[in-house]
């Protein structure tokens, strides 16, 4: 059974836009869980543009399964060791990007990533790596000691033509196949919506989808409960 993890970052984005204390991403997380979400995701960015440190602590307490997305930095490593999420997903981070633009480049940054993985594993925190759908990056993830990968689906979701979308889908399919053959847990996310998910669910080897913006956007119109249930219906 493929699971759904709901990212609540953009509930916090709406809150931070006005500098108030609502809407509360923790309340959104609770509603998502009640609707059937299998996990809650939050990305604590270095610039704290949406999720804040206190959100992470409260989400850890409220979520049945909490996934922390974070950059490979000493500060974030310290926070992860304190909070002890159920899973850490290591992601690249650029200050000026609107959202994460690509996967980790393990050919360039494999050393620091492997060191962080070792530290977190030593403290019984499983680690996934957010990577582009590239077999080489999948193999490097395995070599670095990751137990899971999250395949970046952004290029597929943003494809301008059907031909490009099919090409990107084939890249994802190949990456998933390589990851499975290496014994990795395979997750996927970034840009997935109620339309693009229909392609992704044909890849039965994917263990979990991480979806945030499209669910939060739909929730603004129909409520979190229905938004999550509608996505779960498509996944199942």
Curated annotation (Swiss-Prot):
UniProt-listed Enzyme Commission number(s): 2.6.99.2
Pathway assigned to this chain's UniProt record: Cofactor biosynthesis; pyridoxine 5'-phosphate biosynthesis; pyridoxine 5'-phosphate from D-erythrose 4-phosphate: step 5/5
GO cellular component terms, semicolon-separated: cytosol
Binding of 3-amino-2-oxopropyl phosphate, residues: 7, 18, 191, 212-213
Site for Transition state stabilizer, residues: 150
Catalytic activity field: 3-amino-2-oxopropyl phosphate + 1-deoxy-D-xylulose 5-phosphate = pyridoxine 5'-phosphate + phosphate + 2 H2O + H(+)
Entry's Gene Ontology BP terms: pyridoxine biosynthetic process
Residues that bind 1-deoxy-D-xylulose 5-phosphate: 9-10, 45, 50, 99
Cytoplasm as UniProt keyword: yes
Subunit text: Homooctamer; tetramer of dimers.
Stored NCBIfam families: pdxJ, PRK05265.1-3, PRK05265.1-5
Protein name (Swiss-Prot/TrEMBL): Pyridoxine 5'-phosphate synthase
């Amino acid at each position: 059974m493929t699971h759904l993890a709901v990212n609540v970052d953009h509930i916090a984005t709406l809150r931070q836009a006005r500098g108030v204390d609502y809407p509360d991403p923790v309340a959104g997380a609770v509603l998502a869980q009640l609707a059937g979400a299998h996990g809650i995701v939050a990305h604590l960015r270095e610039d704290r543009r949406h999720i804040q440190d206190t959100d992470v602590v409260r989400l850890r307490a409220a979520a049945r399964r909490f996934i922390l997305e974070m950059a490979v930095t000493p500060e974030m490593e310290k926070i992860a060791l304190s909070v002890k999420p159920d899973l850490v997903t290591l992601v690249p981070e650029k200050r000026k990007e609107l959202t994460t633009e690509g996967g980790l480049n393990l050919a360039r940054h494999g050393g620091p990533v492997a060191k962080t993985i070792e530290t977190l594993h030593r403290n019984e925190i499983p680690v996934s790596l957010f990577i582009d759908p590239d077999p080489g990056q999948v193999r490097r993830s395995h070599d670095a000691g990751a137990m899971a990968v999250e395949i970046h689906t952004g290029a597929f979701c943003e494809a301008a033509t059907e031909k490009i979308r099919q090409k990107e889908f084939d890249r994802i399919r190949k990456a998933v196949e390589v990851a499975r053959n290496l014994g990795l847990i395979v997750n996927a996310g970034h840009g997935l919506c109620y339309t693009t998910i229909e392609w992704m669910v044909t890849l039965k080897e994917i263990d979990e989808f991480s979806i945030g913006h499209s669910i939060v956007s739909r929730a603004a119109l129909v409520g979190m409960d229905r938004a999550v249930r509608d996505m779960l219906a498509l996944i199942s």
